[in-house]
């Protein structure tokens, strides 16, 4: 997706052939010889809906980070965070999303929400490992 945007920004035409060649080359690179990459994989990009919505995967990941920040604020029981979340809900899309999130105390223009989500993920991994150790 990033490479396709770079191609477009540099003035290169996005054709079936150019996108297929790029996708094929990326598959060869990513699989690194571990799998046979047949010629038909070059056309796989056409069936992936993510490519039809700009930076869908990045939006999904960043929205997950925002959701973690919002939910942890609510679950903490902090009345100010809960009130900020309620105010956020009342905005109803009247502002750009990044500005709306700031009203809820989540500043996506900083790395903090991503760092916090990764920390939370690490906590979940530790919980999972502890559960496995308890079972074993």
Per-region residue spans from a language model:
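Mg2+-dependent prenyl diphosphate-binding active-site environment of isoprenoid biosynthetic enzymes
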Residues: 1-2
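C-terminal, non-catalytic "cap/extension" segments appended to globular domains
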Residues: 5-136
